[in-house]
């Protein structure tokens, strides 16, 4: 089967320099959603028709299995499909999709293709409570489709028809090429409409078959930011419903956003206003507090992530405790039972089994062993203005508050570092490391008194 995706429109109502089909839905371009669905049908040819912002669109979705046809002039949907004909296999049927209609299920498209398998002309239709503005499907007394009539051309009786044309079709490619060549642009816009092909098919004696989606929102398109926001909420609720079916506890299904792939184990609990981006895996018994952002991360079983935590490109072992207000950046690796607390930032660092950094700390480019305690205000000074260096802290080290470790430096096993110490040389195992300082107490000191105005 050939699949053609129309993605050449300007999208004026989006009021954006970004081509309409590249606006994101759940973190991916609209067009990427359509291409992903098309791939599940395993087409022999997959062609995207580009026009407005063609180079930008091609760059965004380029892949070995995707070919591009260019519609240099915006002369309608029929004209757009015509540009794809040289890239299609004439012996296979062609399914036409739209780059701004992202939520059509693959199962819906399979039903349409199956309905038209005997060489018929297939149309995906939908029945709406309010069909205003859409082309109506006109049938004869026997129920056969006779034509599609646009809103402006419909009679009062036809305006009562609730079944509308979605624009998604499947048809034999050879006949499609012939019908496209016969299209006329005798309309106010001077465009060639793909919807006009159905009458040519009927005139040629073709059976016109229809199929409908399970949900009408599958056929909704995006022409404005308001419609984009509407589809975002529909899509997110669909994802949330699937998570609930899988046993995930969501404090409020309307307040979780998945912008990628979220895999959850058993007894996972997610509080409100959490965002998951890229590929995220949550193992069994993970608890996510409110207002967290987690991107491209794996979280081990029994882990608790408290409120307002940001995690990006990190790996967390089992039974770790993160946050609140913690930030794990790319390359952060936490072993089982590690703790990273409030206002702690970890980047490109390994934190060993049972080690804790509970307050106000920066750990960057570091290797921290097991059972290490990192006191509040500790900083690994990893950057000299030109290059970055690593800090190594071996097992069972106690780091006092307000410590600076100037990399490259190694702290041996069992070391105790006194509060307020700057470490710039390697420290041998088992010692107390401190910078000796003099504490002075002066009697007779009088605090300044605020002057009266």
From Swiss-Prot:
Residues the record marks as active site: 359
GO cellular component: cytoplasm; membrane
EC number assigned by the record: 2.7.7.23, 2.3.1.157
Locations listed in the record: Cytoplasm
Keyword NADP among record annotations: no
Cofactor names: Mg(2+)
Chain segments carrying region Linker: 226-246
Cofactor detail note: Binds 1 Mg(2+) ion per subunit.
Primary location group: cytoplasm
UniProt: Mg(2+) binding residues: 100, 223
Region (N-acetyltransferase) location: 247-453
InterPro entries assigned: Bifunctional_GlmU, GlmU-like, GlmU_C_LbH, Hexapep, Hexapep_transf_CS, MobA-like_NTP_Trfase, Nucleotide-diphossugar_trans, Trimer_LpxA-like_sf
Pathway the protein takes part in: Nucleotide-sugar biosynthesis; UDP-N-acetyl-alpha-D-glucosamine biosynthesis; N-acetyl-alpha-D-glucosamine 1-phosphate from alpha-D-glucosamine 6-phosphate (route II): step 2/2; Nucleotide-sugar biosynthesis; UDP-N-acetyl-alpha-D-glucosamine biosynthesis; UDP-N-acetyl-alpha-D-glucosamine from N-acetyl-alpha-D-glucosamine 1-phosphate: step 1/1; Bacterial outer membrane biogenesis; LPS lipid A biosynthesis
Keyword Acyltransferase: yes
A GO MF term: magnesium ion binding
Residues noted as binding UDP-N-acetyl-alpha-D-glucosamine in the record, renumbered to the chain: 6-9, 20, 71, 76-77, 98-100, 135, 150, 165, 223, 329, 347, 362, 373
Similarity comment text for this entry: In the N-terminal section; belongs to the N-acetylglucosamine-1-phosphate uridyltransferase family.
Listed name of the protein: Bifunctional protein GlmU
Lineage start: Bacteria, Pseudomonadati, Pseudomonadota, Betaproteobacteria, Burkholderiales
């Amino acid at each position: 089967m050939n699949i053609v995706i129309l993605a050449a429109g300007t999208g004026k109502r989006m009021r954006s320099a970004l081509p309409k089909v590249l606006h994101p839905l759940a973190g991916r371009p609209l067009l990427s959603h359509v291409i992903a669905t098309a791939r599940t049908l395993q087409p022999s040819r997959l062609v995207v028709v580009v026009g407005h912002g063609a180079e930008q669109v091609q760059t965004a979705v380029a892949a070995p299995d995707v070919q591009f046809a260019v519609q240099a002039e915006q002369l309608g949907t029929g004209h757009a499909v015509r540009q794809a004909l040289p890239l299609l296999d004439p012996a296979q049927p062609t399914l036409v999709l739209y780059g701004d209609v992202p939520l059509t299920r693959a199962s819906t498209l399979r039903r349409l293709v199956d309905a038209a398998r005997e060489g018929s002309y297939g149309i995906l239709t939908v029945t709406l409570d309010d069909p205003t503005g859409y082309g109506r499907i006109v049938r004869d007394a026997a129920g056969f489709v006779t034509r599609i009539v646009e809103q402006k051309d419909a009679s009062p009786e036809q305006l009562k028809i609730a079944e509308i044309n979605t624009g998604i079709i499947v048809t034999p490619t050879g006949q499609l090429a012939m019908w496209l060549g016969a299209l006329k642009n005798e309309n106010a816009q001077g465009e060639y409409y793909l919807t006009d092909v159905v009458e040519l098919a009927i005139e040629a004696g073709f059976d016109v078959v229809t199929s409908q989606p399970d949900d009408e929102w599958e056929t909704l398109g995006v022409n404005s930011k308001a419609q984009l926001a509407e589809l975002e909420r529909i899509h997110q609720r669909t994802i949330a419903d699937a998570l609930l079916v899988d046993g995930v506890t969501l404090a409020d299904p309307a307040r979780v956003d998945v912008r990628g792939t979220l895999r959850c184990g058993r007894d996972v609990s997610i509080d409100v206003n959490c965002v998951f981006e890229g590929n995220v895996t949550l193992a069994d018994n993970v608890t996510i507090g409110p207002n967290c952002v987690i991107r491209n991360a794996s979280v081990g079983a029994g882990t608790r992530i408290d409120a307002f935590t940001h995690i990006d490109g990190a790996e967390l072992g089992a039974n770790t405790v993160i946050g609140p207000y913690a930030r794990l950046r790319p390359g952060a690796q936490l072993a089982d039972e590690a703790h990273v607390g409030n206002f702690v930032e970890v980047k490109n660092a390994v934190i060993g089994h049972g080690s804790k950094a509970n307050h106000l700390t920066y750990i960057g480019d570091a290797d921290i062993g097991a059972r290490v305690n990192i006191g509040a205000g500790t900083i690994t000074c990893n950057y000299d203005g030109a290059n970055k260096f690593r800090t190594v802290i071996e097992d069972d080290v106690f780091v006092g508050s307000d410590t600076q470790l100037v990399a490259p430096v190694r702290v041996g096993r069992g070391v105790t570092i006194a509060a307020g110490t700057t470490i710039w040389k390697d420290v041998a195992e088992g010692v107390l490391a401190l910078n000796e300082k003099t504490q002075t107490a002066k009697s007779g000191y009088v605090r300044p008194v605020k002057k009266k105005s």
